[in-house]
Every structure is written in C-alpha cells, then in structure tokens.
C-alpha cells in the first residue's frame, strides 16, 4: 500500500495542474534572436513547491531557449520531471524540425494533458513558413486551449494558451503581433497585452486580487515575464539557464507602489523602463533548483 501511495504521489507530481496559461514565442530569422513571454494565474509561491522538481518561477519550468536556433513553451499539465523540456531543448540544438519534435513528445503517457509550442530554424541557417513551427494541444486540456502562429517579415511567431476565457485570447494576440511596430520584443509585448485585454486566464480576476493596495486593472493572471536571447548568447546546461540578453519578470510577491496588480500591465511598465534606459543587458534570473541527472550529456 505504501508503495502504491508513493507511486501515485510521483505520478501526480510529475503531471501537475497547469502552470502556463498563455505564451508567445518568436524568432527573428535574420538575426537569430529568440523570445518567449508568458503569463499565468498561478501564484509565485506555488512554483518552488512543485514535485519532483521545484521551479524558481514560471519561466524556469516552461521556457526552452536555444539562442540563434529556436524557442519553445512547454505548458498546461507541465512535466515537472523536466524530461519533455530537456528533450525539446536537445532536439532544437540538433536542428530537428519542430513537427518531428512534437511526434517524439507524443510518446509521453501524459501527453494529452500537455501543451507545446515550438518555433525554430531547423538547420540553423534557413527558415520557411512550412518548416519552422509546430504546436500540440492535448485532448485533456480545457475547451479554450489552442495555438496559432504565422509570420511578419523576418519575424516568425506562435501563440498558445490553455484555460483561457475564450479562443479570442490567442487569435487577438496573434493579430496584435502582426500589427505591432518596432523590435521583435515590441511585437511580443503587443501580443501579450492583447491576450490580457481579451480575457487571458479565466481563473483570474479582481475577485482574487492578493494586492488590494494596488489597482487591479482587470487582471487575468498573477505572474508574467519576457525572456530575450540574442544569437551569440550562451546556452545553458538545462533548457533555460543560459546567459541571455534580457529577462524581465513580474510576480505577485514583488509588486511596488505605482505598479499594477495586473502583471501584464506591470510587465509593460518594467519593459518600457528597460527600453527607456537603453535596452541594456539585464542581470540573469536566479539559479534554477532543477539539476539534470546527467549534465555531461546535455552540453
């Protein structure tokens, strides 16, 4: 009986409830810059508590970043063992096309609770609308769970989300990406704001605002971030612990006076401040508690 309980605990811990709700992944085929941004109605305090591997924050468990080649989001019933994330990471580094990586992920017995989005330059040199992106949405996810992507000039992107207020969250985010002006990061931020403005995560609203001293601003999530990696940035040992150009995050535990309880609006404030200061390289996020079992094979 004890063995059975332990087994069930490990299974449930590895296939935990949704972390990420919506995310935007993008790559500049000309420069090799890759970006991921995301927001969710999971409080910051919940990430270190995950089993069998805790997480520093949303980005730590969700993002897969390979500078100059590709970026991915692993979300919904997130894999807390990190096996899926590391598989995606290693295959992107090899130049495996996104659609083939998705087929590999389908071997996971819990795949119907997962959601994946991948955008990459398959051979590290060329990119086309047909070979550069792929997504998967498990049948066990909620009704409004989907992905949609496309391109705008040299920018290739995909938006994916689950437990959303409606399909318009993803579609309006994608539309905003294509209508935005400026840098790749500007396009990603526009998509993030559109997702938030169109309902975001249906689990969050001003009724569960944990920072009543700040304006709620129609919040649809608790945490948000954007991570930017340039082509020459150093990749990591894990799927996202490299030395990337910029990382801006908002948690429900680090809000300041003058900011918003809506993390996407505060992310915009912090992003604008970063741009105004010259868009300089930021300090990396703190260390990840996740340690791959065989780091020598992940280099």
Regions found by a protein language model. Give the residues of each.
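Bacterial N-terminal signal peptides
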Residues: 5-17
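N-terminal nucleophile
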Residues: 19-299
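Sec-dependent signal peptide recognition
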Residues: 2-7, 63
């Amino acid at each position: 009986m004890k063995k059975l309980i332990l087994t069930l605990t490990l299974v449930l811990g590895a296939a935990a409830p949704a972390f990420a709700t919506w995310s935007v992944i993008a790559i500049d085929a000309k420069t090799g810059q890759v970006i991921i941004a995301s927001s969710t109605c999971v409080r910051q305090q919940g990430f270190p508590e995950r089993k069998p591997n805790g997480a520093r924050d949303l980005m730590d468990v969700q993002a897969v970043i390979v500078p100059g080649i590709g970026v991915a989001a692993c979300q919904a019933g997130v894999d807390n063992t990190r096996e899926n994330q590391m598989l995606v990471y290693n295959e992107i580094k090899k130049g495996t096309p996104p659609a083939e990586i998705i087929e590999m992920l389908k071997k996971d017995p819990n795949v119907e609770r997962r959601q994946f989005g991948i955008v990459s330059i398959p051979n590290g040199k060329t990119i086309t609308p047909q070979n550069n992106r792929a997504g998967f949405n498990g049948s066990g996810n909620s009704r409004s769970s989907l992905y949609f992507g496309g391109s705008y000039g040299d920018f290739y992107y995909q938006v994916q989300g689950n437990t959303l207020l409606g399909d318009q969250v993803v579609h309006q985010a994608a539309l905003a990406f294509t209508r935005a002006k400026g840098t790749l990061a500007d396009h990603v931020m526009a998509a993030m704001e559109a997702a938030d403005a169109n309902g975001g995560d249906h689990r969050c609203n001003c009724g569960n605002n944990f920072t009543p001293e700040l304006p709620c601003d129609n919040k649809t999530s608790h945490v948000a971030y954007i991570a930017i990696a340039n082509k020459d940035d150093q990749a990591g040992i894990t799927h996202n612990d490299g030395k990337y150009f910029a990382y801006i995050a908002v948690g429900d535990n680090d809000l300041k006076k003058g900011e918003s309880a809506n993390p996407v609006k505060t992310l915009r404030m912090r992003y604008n401040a970063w741009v105004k200061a010259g868009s300089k390289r930021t300090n990396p996020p703190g260390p990840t508690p996740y340690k791959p079992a065989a780091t020598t094979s992940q280099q």
